[in-house]
Amino acid sequence: MTTTKRPIALLILDGWGYRENTHMNAIYHANTPVLDRLNAQYAHGLISGSGLDVGLPDGQMGNSEVGHINLGSGRIVYQELTRISKAIADHEFEQNPALCDAVDVAVKAGGAVHIMGLLSPGGVHSHEEHIEAMCRMAVARGATKVYLHAFLDGRDTPPRSAKGSLSHFDDLFTTLGHGRIASIIGRYFAMDRDNRWDRVSQAYDLITQGKAKFQYDNAVTALEAAYERNENDEFVSSSAITDSEGKVASLNDGDALIFMNFRADRARQITRSFINADFDGFERAVTPKVNFVTLTEYAADIKAPIAYPSENLVNTLGEVLQNRGRTQLRISETEKYAHVTFFFNGGKEEPFNGEDRILINSPKVATYDLQPEMSSTELTDKLVAAIESAQYDVIICNYPNGDMVGHTGNFDAAVKACEAVDACIGRVVDALAKVGGECIITADHGNAEQMTDETTGQAHTAHTSELVPFVFVGRDATIDEGGKLSDVAPTILHLMGETIPAEMTGKPLIHVKE
């Protein structure tokens, strides 16, 4: 006889922060009767999802990858940004074996060192300080042909803010005496994660052949021309930068290609296009044999040297539930599916025993302000059915809308996104009530609560460092103040009556009144 489950659901409202300032605050201005009622009726508070509380530098805004690793592991996880920055400060970076080997082999063969990555101070997918350290190290080890392929941000930074970074690197290469910016392209193309290979192919052709929609003799000139075409940083068309003789850079056999993004999800597709022999996402005109190095581990099936391999996290929530014979479901749309699976499980691809997964396809639109509800209705249909099936002890669900629509900078669309999510939460809470289940509602980081930059007046498309909501829809309870994302997994185990493993340093935040 099958035991009926009374599930605990964790609803992660991506990009849903709390901000006192109501100006251009899409969450405040949205009509959210369900969340208003739940906040009035149940125990609630605010927790931290940024900075030192999630293993990032002090004051650094949170992000989805970091947030889900902390949520799932039940401990503050030392993030790649902090780890690599520390290695640079300690002069360990310049001795990194994977990076040194790639440079040395290229130099010995008379080849070039190509460095690609998101040229941004955003700190979400990369940091330009890391890219600078790599350029300096390559020249210091004897490389005379150093080519930087700059992916432009405008998403975790203001929409038109790349000029300072490009100017800085022009000056850097002048100071070093070798190297140059070889190409620029928006992250929309180079860092797609939704199998839109027509975008990725443009970045691939640009890096391998110097084949581009536009050609300029200077990166800042190329950027200014993009702005004239009304392209913000994120959407800058492929632009090859020529040398003093009018030649473009190309990727050749024996060259080194070093990918300086440290976050995995938006690095995987373009990486596979370079290294997979059986790659079929698009027709590759050339397939140069290069020494490809990734800064961190992007996926278990990506076979390339890794400068900073992942630290092994044991006894994450998923693993503990498996070891205790519990069942669990992970569910989200394409855009955040990796976050409720790979990242929530501490960087492990394979599901745990008793872990089911449901992937809902995100809508195929150019930008999500065109469909702010995304696939939330279908996602909720599947989630409600899973609750009603009484198969699961724990359900982890991510609603991507607040973040994905927040990133577009479209205030009205972000309001609609929040309203769509609120309606879905109502359905989920009702379904849980019918089976005696309980629910924690929180977020991984802020975004939609700030849709304009108060200083520049530009659209605010980045994450924030605001606190995020923490609501317990269940038994009468109190919630501790001062919580953080790493307290969520221990809280779930505590509510289930399970012991918390020693590796989880977070503390239960919810205390049920007897």
Swiss-Prot record:
Alphabetized Pfam families for the sequence: iPGM_N (PF06415), Metalloenzyme (PF01676)
Cofactor(s) this protein requires: Mn(2+)
Gene3D superfamilies assigned to the protein according to its UniProt record, in alphabetical order: Alkaline Phosphatase, subunit A, BPG-independent phosphoglycerate mutase, domain B
Binding site for Mn(2+) 1: 403, 407, 463
Positions contributing to Mn(2+) 2 binding: 14, 64, 444-445
Pathway(s) annotated for this protein in UniProt: Carbohydrate degradation; glycolysis; pyruvate from D-glyceraldehyde 3-phosphate: step 3/5
EC number per UniProt: 5.4.2.12
Active site positions: 64 (phosphoserine intermediate)
UniProt keyword annotation of Acetylation present: no
NCBIfam families: pgm_bpd_ind, PRK05434.1-5
Record protein name field: 2,3-bisphosphoglycerate-independent phosphoglycerate mutase
Provenance organism: Shewanella sp. (strain MR-4)
Protein encoded by which gene: gpmI
